[in-house]
């Protein structure tokens, strides 16, 4: 599946690595960040950055940021919401592409 933009729902080194690869592939990268990370390298590296009013664990805010930015897909990185089957389902139900294992696989991994 091909897309032109992704929102990276993570921070730090993993966000930088995801963005580096995606930008090499010609994909626009959108970062989300909290105030404490406003000057972090991953925010500066992104083509666009959206400040979250809460935390990296606020799935609804992340989906809202994806819609606001026009992102076509969400890459969760690791940790945070990457192992949350309900979040993966919510991403898909909002007509966004989930870059990661299916919600079913995430649930099975947790059992």
Question: Where in the sequence are the language-model features?
Answer:
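N-terminal beta-alpha lobe that positions the nucleotide/phosphoryl donor
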Residues: 1-111
């Amino acid at each position: 599946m091909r897309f032109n933009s992704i929102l990276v729902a993570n921070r730090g080194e993993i966000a930088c690595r995801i963005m580096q690869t995606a930008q090499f592939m010609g994909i626009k990268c959108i970062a989300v960040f909290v105030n404490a990370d406003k000057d972090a390298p991953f925010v500066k590296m992104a083509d666009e950055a959206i400040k979250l009013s809460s935390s990296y664990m606020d799935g609804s805010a992340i989906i809202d940021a994806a819609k606001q930015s026009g992102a076509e897909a969400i890459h969760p990185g690791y940790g945070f919401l990457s192992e949350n089957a309900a979040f993966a389902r919510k991403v898909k139900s909002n007509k966004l592409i989930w870059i990661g294992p299916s919600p079913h696989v995430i649930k099975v991994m947790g059992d």
